[in-house]
């Protein structure tokens, strides 16, 4: 089937999750009922995996973070997911934490996706957010600010590799000098 060939060509190995809109853009010959019929056929034959309504993967090794970003857009991976991955907190978290326009928890293929609501002007400010490999993810500095802003004062196990100038800039430009974040920065830079 030419649809699946076009799909493999378009990914270049980077994209692992596709929305219905992306699938229709890959091959413009497939629209409406023809697209739905092709997707149904590919899912039935095991060439595509249906992750959730309107979202598909080529195989089971898809990126759960990529899916989580696409499932609720705009969103970015942050909080304990980034803090654990970057070694700032040592307790492992199996859930994926993201910030988006609304709070909700979804379980998709056995993985908890926890979306936390944050104001639009903060959500849409790109300072401290890295986009690559089809994933938008906070830097450790942005994740610290996000966590303190949403959850209050926190203890972090390892802040040795934090860029303190970046964290101050994020507090100033994204959080408009939030007092709780500023106090945390002041208390923790004294320890250095």
Predicted regions and their residues:
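Nucleic-acid-binding surface
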Residues: 58-192
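Short beta-edge/loop segments at beta->alpha junctions of small alpha/beta modules
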Residues: 1-74
